[in-house]
């Protein structure tokens, strides 16, 4: 089961472009254009190709990033496997790193190559070193893309297919923090636009938390979608965020809000201290020393550091993140002294992040998401007990039904899983996991027509499901439809060069 990314943003249908805002707010607009948030996506133009060739030692695959007539591209090679892909868009400001996207008939996937700014080198993208071949089909979901691009253009009913272009405005637009701008542009009244600094603390902080608070797991509220949250809302009305009880885990790419909440400064200052206390959202970072001396003037005078030193050098050190190589981020926990990250025990409890729901339904879904991770299958019994109760309390909750069905199927109880999958799909036909899982049971029971119907539907939602495509080819093979079997195997080989299963089956079919 693929991890579900649960972030929520303004839908493109309500968008006014940032250029329209510039007509009245030129000075702010010009400053903002030079911030990292303004350049978190776009078309690659000035990439550093000085160290653009590398070999992945564990697999022996050699990668090279280069420019051709169409733009940026990369190739991979380990005889006899080789291939290349265009890289039409980048993701990430480049302040620490930059990832790239590949496209196949409008379906977007994260490329296995990335650029790391501090090291000034190209290497595999985060988590790609676990694969024995170039992995080209990690889906780029709207919930992920929306933290880097604006005015998205997703195709309804799919998970990762987009129109052309996939987003109308690169980077984080004005509306991402200020909400819909059409009424404000028409009236020029302050009441018709969101100013985060003037919101109540929980709504103000939600504007930043939508992208900078992941916790250990996020659980979507019933009926919520990636576009549910609007600036001015409480993020907690759309999702629940859970963290590990009593733990101070290492820094991750999106742990800024969580780490700040762990700091003595935040715990003492409360709502007075927030992201905007130190960060100018329209420009570069404010003077840290001035901010710190506002509370620490007396103690700072007795500090061993020199009078004009930057407080953050010691108290907000740059540290390696735990979920990406070659990347360092600022430690927002503001430690008095540098400390080693705590090791989170396998059985540590999940607790709601302050201000977010800890309802039994949300907790059940959170444990189910954790237990679906390959390294956390030992949490299945706990997740199962919570899901069973949640299923009784919420019999029409498609998310609960799907995760419950997944545990039953993965523990050898398909008869219990089938009605749950079917009910979930009746409630929400877009449920990809249910479509794939129910098709798997049909295949195991040699109900090939049912498996074919479900898996064709799954591939319409996400064309990059190579295992599903390979098994679909086998289902067609079983009913004697060799043309469709070959068609899907050819596509599987093209989408996953180096993956032995479809290549072997295709060779066998063509003998």
Regions found by a protein language model. Name each.
Residues 27-93, 99-104, 112, 124-129, ...:
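Primarily the internal scaffold of c-type cytochrome electron-transfer domains
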Residues 398-399, 432-433, 466-467, 500-501:
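Helix-start (N-cap) detector for alpha-helical repeat units in TPR-like alpha-solenoids
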Residues 410, 444-445, 478-479, 508-511:
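Register position in tetratricopeptide repeats
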């Amino acid at each position: 089961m693929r991890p579900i990314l649960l972030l929520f943003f303004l839908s493109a249908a309500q968008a006014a472009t940032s250029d329209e805002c510039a007509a009245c707010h030129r000075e702010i607009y010009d400053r903002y254009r030079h911030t990292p948030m303004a350049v978190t996506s776009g078309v690659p133009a000035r990439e550093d190709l000085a160290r653009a060739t590398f070999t992945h030692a564990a697999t022996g695959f050699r990668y090279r990033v280069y420019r051709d007539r169409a733009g940026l591209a990369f190739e991979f090679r380990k005889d006899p496997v080789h291939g290349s892909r265009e890289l039409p868009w980048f993701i990430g400001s480049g302040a620490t790193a930059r990832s790239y996207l590949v496209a196949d008939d409008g379906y977007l996937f994260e490329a296995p190559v990335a650029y790391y700014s501090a090291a000034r080198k190209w290497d595999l993208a985060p988590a790609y070193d676990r694969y024995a071949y170039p992995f080209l089909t990690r889906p780029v979901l709207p919930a992920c893309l929306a933290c880097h691009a604006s005015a998205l253009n997703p195709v309804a009913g799919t998970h990762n297919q987009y129109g052309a272009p996939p987003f109308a405005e690169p980077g984080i637009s004005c509306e991402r923090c200020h909400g819909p701008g059409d009424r404000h542009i028409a009236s020029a009244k302050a009441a018709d636009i969101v100013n985060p600094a003037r919101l109540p603390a929980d709504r103000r902080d939600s504007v930043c938390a939508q992208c900078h608070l992941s916790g250990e797991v996020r659980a979507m509220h019933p009926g919520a979608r990636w576009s549910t949250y609007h600036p001015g809302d409480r993020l907690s009305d759309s999702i629940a965020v859970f963290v590990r009880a009593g733990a101070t885990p290492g820094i991750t790419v999106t742990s800024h809000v969580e780490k700040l909440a762990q700091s003595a400064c935040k715990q003492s200052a409360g709502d007075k201290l927030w992201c905007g206390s130190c960060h100018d959202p329209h420009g570069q970072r404010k003077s840290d020393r001035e901010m710190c001396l506002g509370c620490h003037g007396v103690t700072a005078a007795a500090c061993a550091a020199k009078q004009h030193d930057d407080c953050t050098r010691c108290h907000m050190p740059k540290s390696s993140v735990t979920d990406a190589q070659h990347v360092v981020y600022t430690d927002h926990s503001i430690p008095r002294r540098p400390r080693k990250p705590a090791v989170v025990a396998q059985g540590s409890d999940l607790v709601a992040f302050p201000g977010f729901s800890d309802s039994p339904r949300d907790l059940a879904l959170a444990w189910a998401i954790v237990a679906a991770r390959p390294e956390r299958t030992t949490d299945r019994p706990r997740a199962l007990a919570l899901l069973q109760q949640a299923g009784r309390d919420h019999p029409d909750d498609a998310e609960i039904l799907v995760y419950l069905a997944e545990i039953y199927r993965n523990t050898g109880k398909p008869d219990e899983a089938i009605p749950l999958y079917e009910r979930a799909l009746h409630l929400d036909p877009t449920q990809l996991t249910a479509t794939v899982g129910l098709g798997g049971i049909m295949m195991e029971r040699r109900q090939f027509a049912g498996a074919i119907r479900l898996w064709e539907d799954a591939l319409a939602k996400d064309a990059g499901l190579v295992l599903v495509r390979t098994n679909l080819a086998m289902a067609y093979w079983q009913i004697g439809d060799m043309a469709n079997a070959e068609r899907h195997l050819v596509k599987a080989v093209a989408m996953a060069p180096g993956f032995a299963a479809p290549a072997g089956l295709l060779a066998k079919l063509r003998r």
